[in-house]
A protein has these predicted regions:
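Beta-rich nucleic-acid/ligand-interaction surfaces
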Residues: 259-267, 345-351
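Histidine-centered divalent-metal-coordination microenvironment in nucleic-acid enzymes
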Residues: 217-219, 224, 262-278, 368
Length: 498
């Protein structure tokens, strides 16, 4: 069996152009060594098997031989990534191929690199397919809802082992360029099959890679070559505009640089982009505005639950200048009547989530106004999912959610199945600790529907979509009311706009 599985993996690598025909013997011997084998018999027939099946079988064999170091998905991932790393071309080969493709077109280069990142199993497509996805038709357009099932949860034994493992400062974080080719351990994911492409943004060395979890099509990450904290400033706007100049078919955005309204990684300067049209991009302008001294920049307030100023021009310098002005003014802006405070006790609250894209020859920059103030009533954030929605979404509203794609926790899959069962059986939802958190939520809409076996799941999906849309409204600094719109215009006027 082991010879057959190794032959299948080598065949896969040849077929996906990770190695050539001339590399077969070399690749086979590398895999034999990793599997602790000295002998090999060439199989008569090598069937075309799915990569997940091949790797799973090799991990089973390795476990029997005591090669994994432990039980569970963490150990299996470390081992099968090592196997794929043995078949992944060296960085200089990958960069050379990318540059060759880029000379034809930026799209051809990214098409190739995205396919390559899936072929190496860096993007585990068979896990990504497990994510639950649907569309909710909100008043703001079609909102994408996903329940993230592709990121494996560590089992308790692996968590305990990681806690007891020696601390290491290398790589400094999961985004550092030093992850390329890293073998990994119980604390850090294996990245032997991971490759990055050097790019220049704002005169600095940055790198392009794809997210292994692919929340949307061609979900890429641009990361600084230097491990430094995220910072929203003029230099970042310039880098974003550089990125969409290099890759005009991609958008690029950055999480905010403050806790609560930022992403999960604030310690490493990075952006996220890709080839996908989010609901926010499709959203119309609710109100046209203009700014003195920037007559060549079209501007407007976007019809969106969060507070968004959209800038558009073929003059990228003017867009960067105006974006810097708006950011600077917002950082120091206080409007107590609208409950906007620049700082409290010396702690800053105002920042921006920026997103850049091309519209033909023009550059477009969306500036989402964010504020991370907390109160006794809202200890996790006033402009953060409120407590009555925590059963669906409690985590930060980062860049991806801001644009209209919900990334909801994996627990919801099980909880919604249990909730459906309870609804159809008439059970007391509040009495079941596994789903009691959803009891008040269900009470609010239960009388609107007739629940049947055929319809209940779709009803729950619709209500999840409705709740996530309300979460986005919570995150909006200025609400979609007359008072909210007037308060936002006060800020626009503060920036010499009208």
């Amino acid at each position: 069996m082991i010879c057959e599985r190794i032959a299948q993996l080598v065949e896969y690598a040849v077929r996906h152009r990770l190695i050539t025909e001339e590399d077969r013997i070399w690749a086979t011997n590398r895999l034999l060594d990793a599997m602790g084998e000295d002998e090999y018999t060439v199989p008569e027939n090598v069937c075309d098997c799915d990569l997940e099946e091949i790797l799973s079988s090799l991990c089973d064999i390795a476990a029997e031989k005591g090669l994994l170091g432990g039980d569970g998905i963490v150990y299996r991932d470390l081992f099968d990534t090592r196997l794929m790393g043995l078949l992944t071309p060296a960085p200089h080969e990958v960069i050379s191929e990318f540059e060759k493709k880029y000379s034809v077109s930026p799209k051809e280069a990214t098409d190739w690199f995205y396919d390559f990142s899936r072929s190496t199993d860096y993007i585990r497509t068979y896990r990504v397919k497990k994510d639950m996805k649907w569309v909710y038709p909100s008043e703001f357009g079609d909102i994408d809802i996903t329940i993230n099932l592709s990121k494996p949860e560590k089992d308790p034994k692996a968590i305990a082992a990681a806690k007891n493992a020696p601390q290491s400062g290398y790589p400094k974080c999961a985004l550092c360029a030093e992850n390329e080719g890293y073998a990994g351990n119980l604390r850090s994911a294996a990245r032997e099959n991971h490759r990055i492409i050097p790019i220049t943004l704002g005169g600095e060395r940055w790198y392009l890679q794809y997210s292994p979890y692919v929340y949307y099509n061609e979900h890429c990450i641009a990361l600084s070559g230097e491990h430094r904290p995220m910072k929203i400033n003029r230099a970042l706007f310039e880098k974003m505009l550089d990125f969409v100049t290099i890759f005009p078919h991609y958008f690029i955005g950055s999480n905010a640089d403050l806790p609560i309204v930022g992403g999960s990684i604030l310690s490493h300067d990075h952006m996220q982009g890709g080839r996908y049209e989010f609901a926010m991009e499709r959203a119309e302008i609710a109100r046209n505005i203009s700014f003195d001294g920037f007559e060549n920049v079209e501007a407007g307030i976007v019809e969106w639950p969060l507070s968004v100023i959209r800038l558009r021009s073929d003059d990228r310098g003017a867009i960067a200048d105006l974006a810097e002005k708006i950011l600077t003014e917002w950082r120091g802006y206080t409007d107590a009547t609208a409950f906007v405070f620049a700082e409290t006790d010396g702690v800053p609250h105002n920042t921006i989530t920026p997103i850049a894209r091309r519209r033909g020859e023009k550059f477009e920059l969306d500036l989402v106004l964010r504020n991370n103030i907390t109160t006794e009533e809202h200890p996790l954030g006033v402009y953060h999912p409120h407590a009555d929605k925590h059963n669906i979404k409690k985590e930060n509203i980062g860049l991806i959610e801001v644009m209209g794609l919900a990334v909801l926790p994996a627990r919801l899959k099980t909880e919604m199945a249990l909730l459906k069962e309870a609804i159809l059986s008439g059970a007391d939802i509040s009495a079941d600790e596994r789903i009691s958190k959803h009891a008040k939520w269900f009470e609010a809409f239960k009388d609107k529907y007739v629940f049947t076996e055929a319809d209940t799941e779709e009803i729950l999906k619709g209500e999840i979509g409705k709740t996530f849309t309300a979460v986005l409204c919570d995150a909006g600094v200025y609400k979609r009311t007359e008072e909210g719109e007037e308060a936002m215009m006060r800020f626009v006027r503060h920036c010499d706009g009208k």
